[in-house]
Design a protein with these regions (language model features):
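Extended interfacial segments that mediate partner engagement and assembly in macromolecular machines
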Residues: 60-72, 78-185, 205, 220
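Terminal RNA-binding accessory module
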Residues: 1-76, 364
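Conserved loop-to-beta-strand segment in the C-terminal subdomain of adenylate-forming
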Residues: 54, 206-210
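Flexible loop/N-cap segments at domain edges
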Residues: 198
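Short, conserved phosphate/pyrophosphate- and ester-handling motifs at nucleotide-, phospho-/glycolipid
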Residues: 40, 163, 286
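Structural signature of eukaryotic scaffold interfaces centered on beta-propeller domains
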Residues: 201-203
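Rossmann-like S-adenosyl-L-methionine
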Residues: 2-11, 19, 218, 222-405
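Short, acidic/hydrophobic/Gly-rich beta-strand patch recurrent on exposed beta strands
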Residues: 23-28, 145-148, 212-214, 343
């Protein structure tokens, strides 16, 4: 087996792809990852990094393109790290995701079950209802956009195809306010400067907009002028919030939220229910796909109206309340206090008297239900990205529900 070195030129055949858009080739038994290459392609590459377990190569040219390769419709791709697969047609992207799920089930989970086809979205542009623009200074001026892949270097963008159009005017208004009043962007190297992120939530059904400015200070300077600039940027802004975040690190939001205009929340409709959304509240970013997901969850739960349902990681109660309409009792459990406050409010404003919410972890929930002699018939889990922890799995097993969704 020949040894690969940084700078080596190669021609490789791409066999598969990772979920983040890197093609996978094999050279003398060694796995080589090629960002931007698609399965089935023959490519000219140069070795960029040789690690202990993997080799990474730079794509120089595509010698034999895949039938699924398309011209990217975004001028910032692939420099911007927001999207990974804009060079692949959408149907093939769905197939890739299905293959990835199947691989996780088989390779990691040791399961022989087959993954169902991925349900694609009818709308693939302008669908996100949340935007997070990191802010930096470049060449003496503030810019906002998205981090380049695996870096903290901001790629300035004028328009992002997957964000709502209102985000462009809001971003522009904040940057103009910063320039006019000489308000510096945050520098994570020196921990100086002010503005860290421009954070936007958009109600897909209501049209309401929440703007949150995250800054490295306890008191935001020129906040009245900021409010005026944002309100002049266009209609729809319902509330403007300031979140101080003076900690080092890459956490976006702070722990405090001070309304500068409005009450700090917006309202949106999902699956025919009304939800109050604060800046830190979890809410699926693709509204249309979230409705399809939740409707499927209710269908899989097979509710007849006589069941007690437990929703772990319930967030603001979106899934819990969807389930409550079809169950005898729905219990939501979430460890974030603000989310539970929103969930209780959402239950009340939707008249859901059979929904109950608790701020605790899953292990505590299992003990509480046991003490109350309550056994859930159905448990629904929609965990954060890191997945369901081992102790939560043990708690679910101990509760012995008839169905887990």
């Amino acid at each position: 087996m020949s040894e690969l070195h940084r700078g080596d030129p190669l021609q490789v055949s791409i066999e598969t792809a990772t979920i983040d858009g890197s093609g996978v080739a094999r050279v003398d038994g060694q796995v080589v990852f090629v960002p931007g290459a698609l399965p089935g392609e023959r490519c000219s590459v140069r070795i960029a990094h040789v690690g202990r377990s993997a080799v990474f190569a730079q794509l120089l040219s595509v010698l034999t393109p895949s039938a699924h390769r398309v011209e990217p419709d975004c001028p910032y791709f692939p420099l911007c790290g927001g999207c990974a697969l804009r060079h692949m047609d959408y149907e093939q992207e769905l197939a890739l995701k299905q293959t990835h799920v199947q691989s996780c089930l088989t390779r990691i989970g040791g399961q022989t079950i087959s993954a169902l086809p991925i349900t694609g979205a009818a709308q693939t542009d302008g669908y996100r209802n949340k935007v997070q623009f990191p802010v930096q200074e470049q060449d003496g001026r503030p810019v906002a956009g998205f981090f380049s892949g695996k870096t903290h270097r901001v790629i300035p963008v004028r328009h992002c195809r997957i964000q709502p159009d209102c985000a462009d005017a809001i971003r522009g208004a904040v940057l103009a306010w910063m320039e006019q009043y000489h308000i510096r962007a945050y520098d994570e190297q020196t921990h100086t400067g002010y503005i860290r992120h421009i954070y936007i939530r958009f109600g897909a059904e209501s049209g309401q907009i929440l703007v949150c400015i995250v800054a490295n200070c306890a008191q935001l300077p020129k906040k009245k002028q900021l409010v005026a600039a944002l309100l002049a940027a266009g209609p729809g802004i319902t509330t403007i919030v300031f979140s101080p975040n003076t900690k080092k690190g890459n956490t976006v939001l702070g722990t405090e939220f001070h309304p500068l205009y409005g009450d700090g929340t917006i309202t949106d409709m999902l699956c025919g229910l009304q939800f109050r959304l604060s800046a830190p509240a979890f809410y699926q970013v693709n509204h249309a796909q979230a409705e399809r997901l939740y409707e499927k969850a209710v269908q899989l739960a097979g509710l007849t109206g006589n069941e007690t349902v437990l929703d772990l990681y319930c967030g603001t109660g979106t899934i819990t309340l969807c389930l409550a309409r079809h169950a005898k009792k729905a219990i939501g459990v979430e460890i974030v206090p603000q989310a539970i406050e929103d969930a209780k409010f959402n239950a009340a404003q939707n008249g859901m008297e059979n929904a109950e919410f608790f701020c605790m972890d899953a292990g505590q929930a299992a003990k509480m239900l046991a003490d109350r002699r309550t056994r859930p018939d159905v448990i629904v889990v929609d965990p954060p990205r890191k997945g369901v922890s081992a102790d939560v799995i043990e708690a679910i097993s101990a509760m012995a529900p008839q169905c887990v969704v």
